[in-house]
Regions:
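Nucleotide-sugar-dependent
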Residues: 199, 235, 242-278, 284-293
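Conserved catalytic-core segment of nucleotide-activated headgroup transferases in glycan assembly
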Residues: 11-27, 171-174, 182-250
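Membrane-proximal helix-turn-helix segments that form the acceptor-binding/catalytic region
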Residues: 67-79, 90-108, 112-115, 125-144
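Conserved acidic donor-binding segment of nucleotide-sugar-dependent glycosyltransferases
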Residues: 295-308, 316-322
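C-terminal alpha-helical cap of glycosyltransferases
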Residues: 341-357
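Acceptor-binding helix/loop patch of EC 2.4 sugar-transfer enzymes
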Residues: 41-55, 107-136, 185, 264
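A short, well-ordered alpha-helix in the C-terminal region of glycosyltransferases
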Residues: 316, 323-338, 347-350
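Carbohydrate-associated surface elements
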Residues: 151, 169
Length: 357
């Protein structure tokens, strides 16, 4: 089975792509399902897209990228199906998807609630060209729809009968659990994210200040070299793919604060929680989105909302090594059973094959 994979970003750059279709390739290829990637963005568009301003350059590169997509239509006969990650083009109506659907079955992956209007802080003007209503149309015209969270599945099932829920997965060949990590000294509380989510840590600055004042642990924050925290003794560093696992291994308790100021957040599958758990980090997270399903309060982690709840959860884990080790084992077991590439491999392959059945 030969599949043309239409992805928004160049391969290897987008966290969403890396944690889904690019990772799925590891189980699809041995099953005889070959992917040919076709990114929407040009190299120049990738460089400027998330910068403030640069409207002229963005507009030129958007047009160039869109016309590049049109050339794809002449190559469809070489493929058995077309995989669309989120949308065939970053802007505009579902024209490309409609033209594709007339010729080939579409496997559509929706891992964010693109149907909920949202104005990007760095691309406010272009947000008005997003055509949020097109998502319902793409879901309806697709042969297969793959989603990663329960709320998005509930939306998709209103418009398509062939919906497969596959969580954002962790590769256990890379994220290898070692129970000894929970015995490391000094103990470490930490967070990992990206520059766009650094603001999430500010939500729990008060709790971190109180935890830091106890002097009972290190605090490691990954994703930026400046988190803008006051009164919190911490180490800050940028995220890198090469050091991702080693950096996380230094942490025993993984923080997952989520703000309620983004209308997309309640729909999301929080990949970071699954990554923490796969390595045996005990998660402490906001009771929002997939955290309410993935984190089983008091069994494989804690849910925390108020400042006191954050402090109590973290300090309890710091003071009780047996509780921490027990929750660590359960977290790793749950991640392997439900949120790993290996445990979801058969479902991923079956979803793709259903496009041509």
């Amino acid at each position: 089975m030969k599949v043309l994979a239409l992805i928004p970003s160049q391969k290897g750059y987008s966290p969403g792509q890396r944690g889904s279709v690019e990772l799925w390739e590891k189980v699809l290829e041995p099953a005889g399902i070959h992917l040919d990637y076709a990114p929407f963005e040009t190299q120049r568009l990738r460089e400027v897209l998330h910068l403030a301003g640069r409207r002229g350059t963005k507009a030129v590169e958007m047009v160039r990228s869109y016309f590049g997509r049109l050339t794809i239509l002449g190559k469809l006969e070489d493929y058995d199906a077309v995989f669309v990650y989120r949308e065939a083009a970053l802007l505009g109506p579902a024209l490309l998807e409609r033209l594709i659907a007339r010729k080939k079955p579409i496997v559509y992956q929706l891992d964010d609630p693109l149907f909920v209007p949202y104005r990007s802080p760095s691309n406010g003007l272009f947000s008005y060209l997003k055509f949020f209503g097109k998502v319902k149309q793409i879901v309806s015209m697709s042969k297969v729809v793959m989603v990663n969270s329960t709320p998005i599945r509930q939306f998709a099932e209103q418009h398509n009968r062939n919906v497969w829920q596959v969580p954002s997965v962790v590769d256990l060949d890379k994220f290898v659990y070692d129970e000894r990590d929970q015995l490391r000294e000094p103990k470490c509380v930490g967070w990992s994210g990206s520059p766009t989510t650094v603001k999430n840590i500010k939500m729990i600055e008060g709790a971190l200040r109180r935890i830091s004042a106890t002097g009972r642990c290190e605090i490691n924050l990954i994703g930026s070299d400046d988190f803008g925290l006051t009164g919190v003794d911490h180490e800050a560093k940028r995220w890198s793919a090469e050091n991702e696992v080693d950096d996380l291994r230094r942490i025993q308790i993984g923080l997952v604060p989520l703000p309620d100021d983004n209308p997309w957040n309640p729909y999301k599958f929080i990949m970071k929680t699954a990554q923490y758990m796969s390595l045996g980090l005990v998660p402490v997270g906001t009771p929002m989105a997939s955290n309410t399903e993935v984190i089983r309060h008091g069994e494989n982690g804690f849910l925390a909302e108020t400042e006191d709840e954050w402090v109590d959860a973290v300090t309890t884990l710091l003071s009780d090594v047996e509780l921490r080790r027990s929750m660590s084992r359960q977290a790793a077991s749950d991640a392997a059973e439900h949120y790993s590439l290996q445990s979801n491999a058969e479902k991923i392959v079956a979803a793709f094959r259903s496009a041509v059945e």
